[in-house]
Curated annotation (Swiss-Prot):
Alphabetical keyword list: Endonuclease, Hydrolase, Metal-binding, Nuclease, tRNA processing, Zinc
Protein name: Ribonuclease Z
Residues involved in Zn(2+) 2 binding: 66-67, 215, 273
Gene Ontology MF terms in the entry: 3'-tRNA processing endoribonuclease activity; zinc ion binding
Classification lineage: Bacteria, Bacillati, Cyanobacteriota, Cyanophyceae, Synechococcales
Family: Belongs to the RNase Z family.
């Protein structure tokens, strides 16, 4: 599982940080999942090694402009390229009307399908939002000025590593039967012998998990959805010096993000959604927010545009 940051500023873009967008590349798949789509996101795709044509799912946290203004243009560009078979969009209830209105009023026609999924019920009832044989996505309500939602992607436990040499020593011929054994299934060979895949596989391999949590002030819901995640990506709009402003505007300080990471017992925290006021050279700079968080949760990193993180378990 690979994460790429395309926008790490809050509110407005800066010279070095675009507004919110993050891409997840699911393991063993030639597809991309986009989380939020602030203005200029498609430009960030061009500057990266990612392809718009590979986007299959888009997850929107909330309907503030710095998280959605890039979406109509991005969808239209994908349509012009003619390389998409369809995209599924997950987000708050107003998302569909926003996209439909933009496309209608700009006379844009997409040559592919859009399927919208409202997330409120899954978030409030703690239901799984999406699931297939390898991955599941959960969502949870956050605490912001408008409805906002966190997303968690879990890779399911995988079969243990298949010992090819052991299978060969048992006289099992290579072929499709190896795939059956790797899945732990019982197989019968043409000579009548029966083997269980458990004989040739190591212990099951746990999957990795990622949580994307923005925009929100400190809330227990963020802790709950983040528990024992391998990676928590959490907004860090303000320094602790602006705690009062953070509560007024429904945002987190670096301290709040670190407290959530610590209480949720995550492996790694990455701070994103930084206020433009914290640019290098100002009285408070991004590294000050990083140090603020690391004082509480040492395994913290500062997001920057085009940073890539690979999540793997041995």
């Amino acid at each position: 599982m690979q994460v790429t940051f395309l926008g790490t500023s809050s509110g407005v873009p800066t010279l070095n940080r675009n507004v919110s967008a993050m891409v997840l590349k699911p393991p063993q798949r030639s597809e991309l999942w986009l989380f939020d789509c602030g203005e200029g996101t498609q430009h960030q795709f061009i500057r990266s090694n990612l392809k718009l044509s590979q986007i299959k799912k888009i997850f929107i946290t909330h309907m503030h402009g710095d998280h959605i203004y890039g979406l109509p243009g991005l969808l239209a560009s994908i349509g012009l390229a003619g390389s998409s078979s369809g995209i599924e969009l997950y987000g708050p209830a107003p998302l569909k009307n926003f996209i439909d209105s933009c496309l209608y009023n700009s006379s844009s026609r997409l040559a592919y399908s859009l399927k919208f999924h409202r997330v409120e019920n899954a978030a409030n009832n703690k239901e799984i939002l999406f699931e297939d044989s390898e991955l599941e996505v959960k969502t949870a309500p956050l605490k912001h000025r408008i409805p906002s939602f966190a997303y968690r992607v879990n890779q399911k436990t995988r079969p243990g590593r298949f010992d090819i040499e052991k299978a060969k020593l048992k006289g099992i011929p290579p072929g499709p039967v190896y795939a059956d054994l790797q899945r732990g299934e019982e197989v019968r060979l043409e000579d009548g012998r029966i083997f269980s895949g458990k004989e040739f596989c190591g212990p099951p391999r746990p999957g990795v998990s990622m949580v994307y949590c923005t925009d929100t002030v400190y809330t227990e819901s963020a802790i709950e959805i983040s528990r024992k995640a391998d990676l928590l990506i959490h907004e860090s709009t303000y320094s602790y010096k602006e705690t009062e402003m953070a509560y007024e505007r429904g945002h987190s300080t670096a301290t709040m993000a670190a407290q959530i990471a610590a209480k949720a017992n995550v492996d790694q925290l990455i701070l994103t959604h930084l206020s433009p006021r914290y640019t290098p050279g100002n009285q408070t700079c991004p590294n000050d927010l990083l140090n603020e968080a690391k004082a509480i949760f040492p395994n913290t990193q500062l997001a920057k545009d085009f940073l890539q993180i690979d999540l793997n378990k041995s």
